[in-house]
Regions:
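Catalytic cores of carbohydrate-active enzymes
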Residues: 208-228
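Hydrophobic packing residues in well-ordered alpha-helices of helical domains and bundles
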Residues: 77, 107, 166, 195, ...
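Active-site-proximal alpha-helical scaffolds that flank and shape metal-associated catalytic sites
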Residues: 130-207, 226-252, 256-258
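Terminal targeting/low-complexity segments that flank the catalytic cores of oxidoreductases
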Residues: 1-105, 127-160, 242-372
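Secondary-structure edge/capping motif, primarily at the C-terminal ends of alpha-helices
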Residues: 94-98, 183-184, 213-216
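Non-transmembrane amphipathic alpha-helical segments
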Residues: 84, 91, 121, 177-180
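Alpha-helical scaffold segments in carbohydrate-active enzymes
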Residues: 106-127, 197-215, 233-240
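Alpha-helical scaffold segments that form or flank carboxylate-/histidine-based iron centers
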Residues: 3-6, 71-80, 99-117, 165, ...
Length: 372
């Protein structure tokens, strides 16, 4: 990668093309995609919550009344953009072994739209945040998930195969839907307007994941116990992505009108500023339970249904970080917990088995359109 600092968005686009080639995703259908910034109408032209509620949304950074608020807004954009590019890097090796041409095209669309979302965030940084925005936009293309350099740990983990991919897009991308929704209420108009097209595109990613898991369950070749292990891998990671408990950052994001609650339009009560992240995480957990209920409809009678891991299981962030809770929420001894993790999470032999099944069993996943 070039080390010279970019001066314009066109400079950044040149680096973006180098990044595509460098990570190995410069396929024709991706390179030929028309990358562009997209904006949509927001629910309101006024700030909808926090200390500035009722005032016009800020159209330019200079209108934001405090440098701390400007810095916080930039930071939110940086973290969102970093996840978008990271997810492409995580999924870059899946093109060679897609189960069908339909799935390859779905993967192409998912990674292309993730790239566009990163492009959108960098467009905001470069066009609204001056020198610091340009620096951060360039750094997004210099970090690598496979070098463990992305800002959030979830986006430095490998996505090894298509079961990994489907569980990732169903749950980790669903956290993304929550984050984009909360930012769609932002008092900084360019961010709020950016989220509308991004959410439309993100819905395809979620559907790809949910449909993929259903198709794997319907085929009945991959053992349900292994499918459960990959749910256990990615759901707790998604819990952590909501951030620490009693977060002062989430508190001030709300007070400053930068990031609302997921259910902001429907919420009747005042926001609990001390538990903003916990509120979103709980709503995410409820949504995951409904998803698993839908998947379980495709499991034959008499077989053990899938389930959502408890909010306390395998956490690295928040009140339960590092504590020995089981997938069912039971407190274990440290020794019991170590053994439980070996049983509950994917092990090398599980990854090997899934890889072998996907390479040798042509019917390991049901055809597209075979499930509802």
């Amino acid at each position: 990668m070039a080390v010279r600092r970019i001066a314009t968005f066109d400079d950044w686009v040149d680096l973006f093309r180098v990044w595509q080639k460098d990570i190995g995703v410069a396929y024709p259908e991706i390179v030929d995609y028309k990358f562009e910034a997209k904006f949509g109408p927001t629910r309101s032209n006024e700030i909808e919550f926090g200390a500035f509620k009722g005032r016009p949304k800020w159209e330019k950074v200079i209108q934001i009344p405090d440098q701390r608020i400007r810095d916080a807004m930039q930071n939110l954009i940086v973290y969102q953009g970093d996840t978008e590019f990271a997810s492409v890097e995580q999924q870059r090796r899946l093109f060679q072994n897609a189960p069908s041409e339909h799935d390859r095209q779905s993967l192409c669309r998912v990674v292309t739209e993730e790239m566009r979302h990163g492009w959108q965030m960098c467009h905001l940084l470069i066009n609204h945040f001056g020198y610091s925005g340009r620096v951060e936009a360039q750094k997004m293309l210099e970090r690598r998930a496979f070098d463990q350099k992305r800002l959030l740990g979830a986006f430095n983990q490998d996505v090894d195969h298509w079961l990994d991919f489907f569980t990732y897009t169903d749950f980790v991308d669903r956290d993304g839907k929550f984050q984009l929704t909360m930012l769609s209420y932002s008092g900084f108009a360019p961010v709020a307007q950016s989220m509308i097209p991004m959410l439309r595109e993100e819905s395809f990613h979620l559907g790809t994941g949910q449909d993929g898991i259903k198709r794997i369950v319907r085929a009945g070749v991959v053992p349900l116990t292994i499918i459960q292990k990959f749910i256990n891998k990615w759901v707790p990671v998604s819990y952590d992505l909501f951030g620490v408990d009693r977060s002062s950052s989430a508190h001030w994001f709300y007070v400053w009108g930068l990031k609302g609650r997921y259910d902001e339009p429907q919420a009747k009560e005042e926001a609990d500023l001390e538990r903003m992240n916990e509120h979103s995480r709980f709503l995410f957990h409820l949504e995951c339970e409904k998803l698993i209920e839908q998947i379980n409809k495709h499991i034959p009678a008499g077989q053990t249904p899938l389930y959502v891991p408890d909010l306390k299981f395998h956490r690295y962030i928040g009140e339960f970080a590092g504590q020995p809770y089981s997938v069912k929420g039971e407190l274990l001894s440290p020794r019991e917990y170590e053994e439980h993790l070996r049983e509950a999470l994917p092990q090398p032999e599980d990854i090997k088995l899934v890889t072998e099944i996907q390479a040798t069993e042509p019917n390991w996943i049901a055809a597209k359109g075979s499930v509802q």
